[in-house]
Structures are given as C-alpha cells and as structure tokens.
A protein has these predicted regions:
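Beta-propeller folds
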Residues: 1-316, 321-325, 331-332, 353, ...
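Serine-hydrolase catalytic core recognition
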Residues: 108, 169, 175, 298, ...
C-alpha cells in the first residue's frame, strides 16, 4: 500500500505514520497541525501525530457502493477538477465535513485490459447522460469519532458542488446546483443540527458555470463569483447574504480567486480584459475590499498566474509564459526583492523556433474571431504551403491564447517541417462571455463549424496558402468537433485526426453533457444532430481516429462504435488504439502518437 510518512523541514527525520496493506489517500493536515485526515478503503480516518493513534470516522466504505471523504468519478471530473479529496477541516480542527456517496444507483462501464495473459476487467461507476447519478450528502463528524450530523440540503437529485466552513466553525456553506444546472443556492447549514437555509440564489436560462471563487472573510462576509452580467466578476456580500456589491471592475472577467488577506482587506485574482483580444492574456490583480481599488500586478503581455499567496505578508509565487516562451516562476515578496526560480525558458530562447502571430479574422454576422497563426520556418511568400488547423470548439473554451503549451511545441515542429499551423476560436468561446457560450445550448457543432469555415475562408485569402491541403485535428471535445466538421462539410479539409472523441453524446457523463444539451429524453433531436456518429456515411476526407483503451473519461466505446458504423458504410479510415492509456497519453504512447500524427499529415498533405 501507499503508507504515510512525515519528514521534519528542520532536518532529515523521516517518520513512518501508517502500516497498512491498503493505501492512504488524500492526506491533509488539520489547521492546527496536530492531526492528519486521510481516506483508506473509502472510509475517513484521523491520525494524531503526537500519539500515533488512528480514529476511524466512518465504517460503511465499499468500492462502487459507498464512498466517504473522497469524490466519486463524475464529481471529481466535472465538479472538482480531478481533485480526489472530499473532506474539509473545521477552522478549529475539531470537526470534519465530508462527502458520502451512495453509488448503488449508478450504471457500470467496464474497461478491459487485454495486456495480461488473462485480461483484467475494471468496473467503473459512470453516470451517463440522463441516467441515475450517485446520491450524495454532506456529514459533519467530530475528530474523536461518534455520530455523524447529516446536513439537510434537500433535493437528492441535485449537486452539492462546493463545501466551505464559516470562519467561526459553527456552520458549513454548501453550494447546491439543480440537476438541470439552471439554479444555484448557497446554503448555510448548522454544523450541530444540520439545518440549512439559503444565503443567496442564482438562476440562468441555460446553465450556471460553477466557479472556485467563493471565500469567507474573517468577519463572516464573503466573496462570490457570478456571471450575472455576462462576464464573471467578484461580489462582496454581508454575512447574512445581503448586499452583493461588485468589487472587480466592469470590463474585466475573473478566472480565479487566488488569495485573500488574513484581515480581509484585499484579494488577489487572475483576470482578463473583456474587450477585443484581451482574453489571450491573463493578468494578476489585487483588489481592495475596503475601497474597491483595482491594481494590475502583472501589466506585461502573456499568461500570468499567482500561487502560494501569503495571507499575512502578501508575498506570492508568480508564474508567467507566452505563446513562444515556456513558463518561468519567481517569488514576489510584497515590496521585497524578486527571487527567480529555475526555468527551462533560456534553452528555448536560443532555439530560434517559429513564432506565433495573434490576430482577428472576419467571423459570422460581422463578428471578429480570435486566431493564431504559425508560419512555416524559412517562410517564402511566393511558395504555397499546407496548413494544419488545431481546434477545440466547446462552450467557453479557448485555444487562441498567449500562453505556452507542450502541444504548441509539436506545432512548432510541424512548422519547421514545412507546415503552417492555424487556430480560430468560435463565437461560443471564452472571448464572447456567457452570452456567447449560450449559443451552444441544446445543440453542439453548428457554432464551431461556422467558426472553422470562417477560418478556412481567411486562409484561402492568403496567397501563400494551398487550400487544397488543409488538415484539421483536435483532442477530446476537439476530436468530436473535428469529426463533426469533416462529416458535415466533406471536401473542405483533406485530412483530419480525431483524438479521444465523443462520437455519441448519449455516451458521455451526466454532469457535463446535461449542462449543455439537457437530458436525452428532453432533447432527442439535439443529441442526434450534435453527435458525429449520425453523419458517418458522409466521410470523404482522410481520417485517423485515436483512442486510449483505458480511457475512463471518454470511453473507447465511442471510437469503437464509430469504427463499426464507418465499416458498415464502406468508408475507408485509419484508427489507432493505445493499450493502457487514459484520456491523456503518457510516456512512449505520447511520443508514438505525435510521431504517427506527423507521419499522417506529411503523407496526406505533403509539404
């Protein structure tokens, strides 16, 4: 198992804390540093560091049946950004609030590992769109053990999406999101009796995007992120839920609440200006919670983020990159000397790789769409070049940014091999705010297709582009949209790669899919028309479909079913399945995929 060890920062004094066959997961120190809580065998435990004594706080944990203190798959993926832990210490370290999941209603997806002599079967509880979700509740238990107080959150088929203790530790704040994701309540629940009452509520006609930008101040007031005016801003509420005054300025959208001062006088956020191409960058800003003052701490172009902010001193770790420079980090003491941290950036500065250009192009209905262009190395305007187009295309997504990515490095490799590389974000992307995202409600594909066709029109206007040699590719939702594009506009792109695509939206998980498409029984036409598998007989272009056989997010069932339909239609295509690989490839499989993608585009587009 994975036992826990404790090492003193003052010296090499490694101490083993647990001796168990089962692994300890999601360990977290109590606020006073005297205990560690963790999950073992789907139950919640507390270990006293002074005595070494363990206390088991729950007893009914069982795989695929009951989970305590840990997220089930769909909550971890869609609500908590793949965070495993599902428990929260009280401020005084005396109690723990935790999730309890009843997974018995949830259907099972079976993943098969064919690599051993006898294949290994893994059963995954995975609620597909329209199917039963896990039943979740929040309990509060004393660290000494004893009876759990269950919070009366009501509405069992809703999502209990965020859990936070009040500063005094006498209550727990729970964000309850309706299953259709149109209504969000912030509940205040007594930690002793479990009685809940609403502090505030929000409603939106399509769906509400959950944020991680709720934070209590020491005096009980709280910060709350909302897109009520079409862009995400922070609002300051009284402890009773009244008020709700904006503290971040109009014309800026907040993407993260990074930290709050110990005395509640300021907050640090990551944000971008909403006008024009402002969203390509990310700025770190400090907002005064006394005067609503707004100070940009990172005015330079690029993608900036803040981490490890000291609530006492205001010191923080600043990380920065741009489209052509890998991330650099530095410690920024409040008023002190900058401390640079190690970076790989100087190596790439000397590599003379092709540089990205960020621009706008004409879009549907007179709009301007954000785009990125990478010209081939040794660019000659009298030559005609093939173009690889990379996209994602989902609601609120963003590909066109001024930030480094590993995938961008492969695009630069392709530019060195004679390709131009291009991306365009459509009218439902992050650049157009919540009202833009809403264009995808109950129907995927059409908005992105219009954006990609606008991109093709722009490329055709460039005299050095050979529009007969256009390639399209994407991963996950981008793989789905790649299929949708080539199947609905055959002949526009000569070759395409669809990586880990959803091919039938009935096969994807409940939280993500229902947010945008509603339930299948309420929107059968939308599911049919949004699913690439509906159009398989239309395939005319060269297609490579790629999927990991251990993908527990977008199941290989999607690509297997697509392959079957393409075979029935008598349509030629290529496919590559990767044993043991999940939704993102690692190790030799990642290298193999990029080598395969390079070979595919060079063969089909012949620079």
């Amino acid at each position: 198992g994975g036992d826990l060890y404790l090492e003193s920062l003052a010296g090499h004094n490694l101490r083993r804390l647990t001796h168990s066959e089962a692994a300890e997961e999601a360990p977290h120190f109590s606020p006073d540093g005297r205990r560690i809580a963790f999950v073992r065998g789907f139950d919640l435990y507390v270990l006293d560091l002074a005595s070494g004594a363990e206390t088991r706080l729950t007893t009914d944990g069982q795989e695929n049946v009951a989970l305590n203190g840990t997220n089930d798959w769909v909550y971890g993926e869609e609500i908590w950004n793949r965070q495993p832990e599902g428990f929260w210490w009280s401020p005084d370290s005396s109690r723990i609030a935790f999730y309890h999941f009843d997974e018995t209603p949830v259907g099972v997806y079976t993943l098969l590992d064919d690599t051993p002599l006898y294949p290994k079967v893994t059963s995954q509880k995975y609620p597909k769109s329209g199917e039963p979700n896990p039943l979740v509740k929040v309990g509060v238990v004393d660290v000494a053990g004893g009876k759990t107080a269950w919070l009366g959150t009501g509405e069992p088929d809703s999502y209990l999406a965020r859990v936070d203790w009040t500063p005094k530790g006498d209550a727990v704040a729970v964000q309850r999101l309706s299953r259709d994701q149109k209504h969000l309540d912030l509940l205040r629940c007594g930690a002793n009796d479990g009685t809940c009452s609403p502090l505030l509520s929000e409603t939106w006609h399509t769906w509400i995007n959950l944020g991680q930008d709720f934070r209590f101040l020491p005096d009980g007031r709280f910060l709350w992120g909302s897109e009520r005016d079409g862009w995400r801003r922070l609002y300051l509420y009284g402890a009773d839920g009244r008020g709700g005054q904006p503290v971040t300025p109009e014309g800026w959208a907040v993407t993260a609440l990074d930290g709050v001062a110990a005395d509640g006088s300021w907050a640090v956020v990551t944000a971008f200006p909403t006008a024009g191409l402002g969203a390509v960058d990310r700025k770190v800003a400090r907002v005064s919670l006394k005067s609503a003052g707004w100070e940009i701490l990172t005015p330079e172009p690029g993608s900036h983020s803040a981490a490890a902010i000291s609530p006492q001193t205001g010191a923080w770790v600043h990380t920065w990159s741009d489209a052509d420079t890998p991330a650099r980090s530095e410690v920024r003491p409040d008023g002190g000397k900058l401390i640079a941290l190690p970076s790989a950036a100087p190596t790439f500065d000397a590599a003379s790789l092709p540089k990205w250009e960020i621009l706008t192009i004409p879009g549907p209905d007179g709009s301007r769409l954000p785009a990125r262009l990478l010209k081939p190395a040794g660019f000659d305007p009298s030559h005609r070049y093939p173009v690889i187009i990379y996209h994602y295309g989902g609601p609120g997504s963003q590909v066109v940014d001024n930030a480094w990515s590993v995938r961008s490095l492969w695009h630069k490799l392709m530019a060195q091999r004679g390709f131009a590389v291009f991306s365009v974000d459509n009218q439902s992307s992050l650049f157009f705010g919540k009202h833009g995202e809403d264009k995808d409600y109950r129907r995927f594909g059409t908005v992105n297709l219009a954006g990609q066709l606008a991109g093709v029109d722009y490329l055709k206007s460039l005299p050095w582009v050979d529009a007969s040699r256009l390639g399209l590719w994407g991963w996950s939702g981008g793989g789905s949209n790649t299929l949708y594009c080539v199947l609905n506009r055959p002949g526009v792109w000569k070759a395409a790669i669809a990586g880990a695509p959803v091919t039938d939206w009935r096969l994807y998980d409940s939280i993500w899919t229902e947010r945008y498409l509603d339930r299948p029984e309420n929107n059968a036409d939308g599911y049919r028309d949004s699913s690439p598998i509906t159009y398989t007989a239309n395939l005319k272009d060269h297609l490579l479909v790629v999927h990991g056989l251990a993908d527990d997010n977008v199941h290989p069932q999607n690509s297997i079913n697509l392959s079957g339909d393409l075979i029935k239609a008598g349509v030629p295509f290529e496919q590559a399945f990767y044993p043991g690989q999940k939704h993102g490839f690692r190790g030799p499989s990642s290298r193999h995929f990029y080598e395969r993608a390079t070979e595919f585009f060079e063969r089909e587009l012949a620079p």
